[in-house]
UniProtKB/Swiss-Prot annotation:
Outcome (variant: residue 98 to G): In strain: MelZim6
Lineage: Eukaryota, Metazoa, Ecdysozoa, Arthropoda, Hexapoda
Residues of the LRRCT domain: 561-620, 751-801
Disulfides per UniProt: 34-45, 43-56, 79-107, 565-597, 567-618, 631-637, 635-650, 755-781, 757-799
Molecular function (Gene Ontology), one example: virion binding
Protein name per its UniProtKB record: Protein toll
Gene name for this UniProt entry: Tl
Result, substituting residue 414 to A: In strain: MelZim3
Gene3D superfamilies from the UniProt entry: Ribonuclease Inhibitor, Toll/interleukin-1 receptor homology (TIR) domain
Tissue: In early embryos, concentrated in the pseudocleavage furrows that form transiently between nuclei before cellularization and in the cleavage furrows during cellularization (at protein level). Later, found on cells in the mesectoderm, stomodeum, proctodeum, anterior and posterior midguts, splanchnopleura, salivary gland placode and adjacent to the segmentally repeated tracheal placodes (at protein level). During and after germ band shortening, localized in a number of cell types, including the salivary gland, foregut, hindgut, Malpighian tubules and epidermis (at protein level).
GO CC term, one of those recorded: plasma membrane
Sugar-bearing residue positions: 80, 140, 175, 235, 270, 275, 346, 391, 482, 508, 528, 654, 677, 703, 715, 730, 738
Ranges for the LRR repeats: 175-195, 198-219, 222-243, 246-267, 270-291, 294-314, 320-340, 343-364, 367-388, 391-412, 415-436, 439-460, 474-495, 498-521, 523-544, 669-690, 693-713, 715-738
One GO BP: cell competition in a multicellular organism
């Protein structure tokens, strides 16, 4: 082992010798040096922010050395050594340069080699501070280890395994000014500091010293700070500090000292700061500081045993004393404790057991700025306690047992800035308690039992007076959290113009109005009203912002209150929802994210942000006394402020007549009467008192069989008469409803409506007012073969022509037939003309011409379209048809309808007056209620006449046909149609419209005819391409001999057989003059071959 040790020391010596041969350099370590070291490969260097980190050996998970270098500032060497030979792994040729501080952590002492050799090896130049911290020294420290560290100013040596140090340890460190040794040292050598005449601070804390050698501090004339804390110096005497007259601060806390001699600090004549904390004092001697007239601060904190009191005049006559910190479970203090120490500025007596204070305690503290009496057991303070502390700015009295604040206690504290009296038992505050504290900025009175009420004043008067704080106009913070306050006082709003924070949380405030939130503070004010008992927040609809208003928002937190969500909070709800008057948004910003309703039951737990304003109601009556109630018996009456309505709810009350109703208050605008599910047979007169004010009448589920207009209140705007026994409504009632009802304000379903001619006014009303009738689609006719929805009917459906008309027509036809037979012989030579006349009277339909049938119609075509497709009508369809090669007369509702007429009547009239109806089918048409009604009218007209009169133009993509209206879907599946964009569009459209052509003569006059009825359908058939190949078989039809046709065309009757659809049954040709033709004229009428292509016509 001895040989191994010698070899190690020899190796280190070789390294040192090599190091001593290197030229010195003052260049600081930089990025280039770091890069070169990484290239070398023995160690790894990396820049980290403004530092460099070196790891040796390179890439090791647990490196032996980790160096952190801040050039020109510090070097930290972190060691992980198992033996002193590991120092050989330090990076070679490293030149760190000048640094101020070197710290070596967890490193071993380098054998018998100086620590300075390691610094030299690393190229560290001129350090002034060395910190050596390690619990693994490897050996005891000696003078040799500190050799060549003459330039050090500060040396800190920390270890836990060193109990003794040599007397000459510090002999070579003559320039040392600050020394710190923490090493569990049990004994201090008497000559340890003999050569340290420049030493200014000694830190020997956290050792195990039991005594100090006499005169050990006598050779250090510059010593200022002596820290001997956390040792075992139980028996200090004045001789321990002999020669230490230059010491200014001494710290002997945590030494287990139980008592001190009265003259222990006699030699410390210049001391300014003494720390006696954390000892075991049960008493202190009188005159302890009599020799220390330069005292500035004394600390006696956390005494380990109770120290009941302090000796009289302990801190008296200290001309420079400023700070006292006394926390030792003190129970009482002498009145002359600080006598004539007039420069004291800070006294901390918090966390003691004081119950009261002598009135003269602060008699001479005219310069006192801060006084801490918190966390004691004070129940009372003398009114004269602060009589002389006129410069006091900070007073802390929290966590005591004080019950009141008198009118004089703070009368001389005009400079007080902060007063904290939290967590006491305060109940009363004299109204003049803060008259003189007009400089107060922060007042904390939270967690007390303050209610601020004046017992001799009426409750209403108390809301109009100021609180005791009204004199503090410059107050910034007023903390009244967790008290018993029930009002927001006027002075908080109107006179505290600098207020920034008002905490009223956890109090007993039960209601708020606009005036309670109208703060005039010129700062951004935060008001905390959470956890009160606020049930009502009433804001007016309109407010006037006076001259005192400023633009600063008041932030009010209203969360966690038991709010009653009734009609009184309407404008508050509007403000929360953002639907508010502008003046509110400029004044308040409310926090309500946790505010929910506590009542009524239906809204319990609902966040106010989700409340709908129309659900907010209040009872009309607040008394249960029948003599005082205005609400009808068996009914519930509420006021709804949202629309200023009185709601009377008498539903399911087994009523047989409308009860007597209260008169509508002048502030109310509406009366809503609910009488659903009763047994009413009739309604009262509209002039009945109370009933005359009803604006919304709900009568569903009664037994009404009729309603007269004089039973409907004049101002009625909503009427629900569904599920009664009504069969009809007369025209006067419908006229009234037409004048007064609003959107979806009428309900008529569930009644057994009779859909006959008497129901025509009702049907027209439902068609004209489909937006007003909320249940229009559920109105059913009961007199049909099966229940039919009224919305699907037209006036022609419910009111067909009189039977008498048909009887008269039959009689006329019969008479006409008799007359024709009677005169047949007389007018034999005119038999052709007579047959034509009979044919014109529906006796010979194949000779009936279209123009003859439609000669009384004003228009060639009625155009049905959605108003959203109007550009197509105006820009294309109308110009092409009215001004094209064949000019047609069109009916367009924008131009040709009668002004003021019913829409359904205009539709029926337009269809009846037009030879064709053109349907411009699009998505807009499908969505249009009126457009679908126009189609339905045209379709039914065509069905009644047995003729095809509808031309469908598909203008745009209509989607899935299966999703269309049933009637329209069926029509499109069974009939042909045109598509906009077809190359033959205009030719096909003009061909499908009525034709007028000049033709031959009959008899003595010219007879102009259009195609036969059969050809009308054939023209429409040409809208879609015809099959290329004709059908292989002729459709079955009833063959009819037409002698008239035969005679007119020069053939025998049996040669001219016509099929009912207008086709020639023999050859599909007609042969005038013995020639066969595919098309031609018969009797002056143009006949079209229905199997011909369009190009053949």
């Amino acid at each position: 082992m001895s040989r191994l040790k010698a070899a190690s020391e020899l190796a280190l010596l070789v390294i040192i010798l090599q190091l001593l041969q290197w030229p010195g350099s003052e260049a600081s370590f930089g990025r280039d040096a770091c890069s070169e070291m990484s290239i070398d490969g023995l160690c790894q260097c990396a820049p980290i922010m403004s530092e460099y980190e070196i790891i040796c050996p390179a890439n090791a998970e647990n490196p032996t050395f980790r160096l952190t270098i801040q050039p020109k500032d510090y070097v930290q060497i972190m060691c992980n050594l198992t033996d002193t030979t590991d120092y050989q792994q330090l990076p070679k040729k490293l030149r760190i340069g000048e640094v101020d501080r070197v710290q070596m952590r967890r490193c071993m002492l380098p054998g018998h080699t100086p620590i300075a050799s390691i610094l030299d090896y690393l190229g560290i130049v001129s350090p002034t501070t060395l910190i050596f911290e390690s619990d693994n020294l490897g050996m005891n420290i000696t003078r040799q280890h500190l050799d060549r560290l003459h330039g050090l100013k500060r040396f800190r040596f920390t270890t836990r395994r060193l109990t003794h140090i040599p007397a000459n340890l510090l002999t070579d460190m003559r320039n040392l000014s600050h020394l710190e040794l923490r090493a569990n040292i049990e004994e201090m050598p008497s000559h340890l500091f003999d050569d340290l005449e420049n030493l200014e601070s000694i830190e020997f804390g956290s050792n195990k010293l039991r005594q100090m050698p006499r005169g050990i501090f006598g050779k250090m004339p510059k010593l200022k700070q002596l820290n001997l804390w956390s040792n075992q110096l139980h028996n200090l005497t004045k001789h321990d500090f002999e020669g230490a007259t230059s010491v200014l601060g001494i710290d002997i806390h945590d030494n287990g000292i139980e008592q001190l001699p009265h003259d222990v600090f006699a030699h410390l004549t210049n001391v300014t700061d003494i720390n006696l904390s954390a000892n075991l004092f049960r008493s202190l001697p009188q005159g302890l500081f009599d020799h220390n007239k330069h005292l500035n601060e004394v600390r006696l904190m956390n005494n380990r045993v109770p120290l009941a009191t302090l000796p009289s005049r302990l801190f008296a006559n200290q001309p420079e004393l400023q700070i006292l910190r006394l926390r030792a479970e003190l129970q009482s203090l002498p009145g002359d404790l600080f006598e004539h120490s007039t420069q004291i500025t800070n006294i901390s007596l918090g966390d003691n057991l004081l119950k009261t204070l002598p009135a003269t305690l602060l008699e001479h503290q005219v310069n006192l700025l801060s006084l801490d009496l918190s966390n004691n057991r004070l129940t009372h303070l003398p009114d004269s306690l602060f009589a002389h502390t006129t410069n006091l700015t900070d007073l802390r009295l929290e966590d005591n047992l004080l019950t009141g604040i008198s009118g004089d206690i703070f009368s001389n504290l005009g400079n007080l800035v902060t007063l904290v009296m939290s967590r006491n038992r305060l109940r009363t505050i004299d109204s003049r308690a803060f008259v003189s504290t007009n400089g107060l900025r922060h007042l904390h009175l939270d967690h007390n039992d303050i209610d601020l009420q004046q017992p001799l004043l009426d409750i209403m008067l108390q809301t109009q007076i100021n609180s005791p704080f009204g004199y503090m106009h410059g107050l910034l913070t007023l903390n009244l959290r967790n008290n018993s306050i029930i009002f927001v006082y006027n002075d908080w709003k109107n006179t505290m113009l600098q207020l920034r924070e008002l905490d009223l949380s956890y109090n007993n405030i039960s209601s708020l109005g606009y005036e309670d939130l109208a703060f005039l503070s010129q700062n951004r004010l935060h008001v905390n009203m959470t956890h009160n008992k606020i049930r009502r927040i009433a804001l007016p609809e309109d407010v006037h912002l006076g001259e005192g208003y400023n633009n600063n928002l008041v932030h009010v937190d209203l969360n966690d209150n038991p709010l009653v969500c009734d009609c009184t909070i309407l404008w508050f709800i509007q403000l929360v929802r953002g639907v508010h008057k502008p003046q509110y948004s400029r004044q308040f910003k409310l926090r309500t994210d946790r505010l929910v309703c506590s009542q009524p039951n239906v809204l319990e737990g609902t966040p106010v942000r989700q409340i709908e304003p129309q659900t907010l109601i209040c009872p009309l009556d607040f008394s249960d006394d029948p003599r005082e109630r205005k609400c009808p018996r068996g009914c519930n009456c509420h006021v709804r402020t949202y629309d200023k309505a009185l709601v009377i709810n008498c539903h399911s009350g087994n009523l047989t007549h409308v009860p007597r109703l209260p008169n509508l208050h002048k502030n109310m605008q509406l009366m809503e009467l609910h009488l659903e599910n009763n047994t009413l047979l009739r309604l009262p007169s509209a002039n009945t008192p109370g009933y005359e004010s009803v604006t919304s009448l709900h009568l569903a589920g009664n037994n009404l069989t009729s309603i007269d207009v004089d039973q409907l209140p004049t101002n009625l705007t909503h009427l629900d008469i569904s599920w009664n026994h009504l069969q009809m409504l007369n025209a006067t009632v419908l006229g009234f409803l037409n004048r007064t009802m609003k959107w979806r304000s009428v309900k008529l379903s569930g009644n057994p409506w009779m859909c006959d001619c008497t129901a025509k006014p009702l049907l027209l009303f439902t068609q004209d007012n489909f937006e007003r009738i909320g249940d229009r689609n559920e109105m059913m006719c009961v007199n049909a073969e099966m229940p039919t929805r009224m919305v699907e009917l037209s006036t022609n459906d419910i009111c067909p022509a009189e039977k008498g008309v048909f009887i008269a027509l039959a009689v006329v036809i019969a008479l006409t037939g008799l007359l024709a037979g009677f005169t047949a012989a007389l007018y034999y030579k005119f038999q052709t003309e007579i047959k034509i006349w009979l044919y014109a009277h529906n006796l010979l339909l194949w000779f009936v011409t279209e123009e003859d049938l439609d000669k009384d119609k004003k228009f060639d075509a009625f155009i049905s379209y959605s108003h959203k497709d109007q550009s197509f009508i105006e820009d294309y369809l109308v110009p092409q048809l009215e001004h094209g090669p064949q000019k047609f007369q069109l009916c367009v509702h924008e131009r040709d309808w009668l002004v003021g007429g019913h829409i359904p009547e205009n539709i029926m009239r337009s269809v009846a007056d037009s030879r064709r109806t053109i349907i411009v089918l699009s998505q807009n048409f499908i969505k249009s209620e009126w457009a679908r009604l126009e189609f339905r009218a045209a379709h039914r007209s065509a069905l009644n006449e047995g003729r095809s009169r509808i031309i469908v133009i598909i203008y745009s993509d209509i989607g899935d046909v299966e999703k269309l209206d049933e009637e329209l879907k069926a029509y499109l599946k069974m009939n042909t149609y045109l598509k906009w964009g077809d190359p033959w569009f205009w030719d096909k459209l003009r061909f499908a419209l009525p034709h007028r052509r000049p033709v031959g003569n009959i008899g003595n006059g010219a007879l102009i005819k259009t195609a036969l009825k059969g050809s009308t359908d054939d023209k429409l058939e040409l809208i879609k391409p015809s099959p290329v190949t004709p059908p292989l078989t002729t459709p079955p039809a009833e063959a009819t001999k037409n002698p008239l046709v035969a005679q007119l065309n020069g053939v025998t009757p049996h040669q001219a057989i016509m099929i009912a659809n207008g086709k020639n049954g023999l050859t599909n040709l007609y042969t005038p003059n013995g020639k066969s033709h595919g098309n031609g004229h018969i009797n002056g009428a143009f006949i079209i071959n229905t199997n011909a292509k369009q190009s053949d016509v």
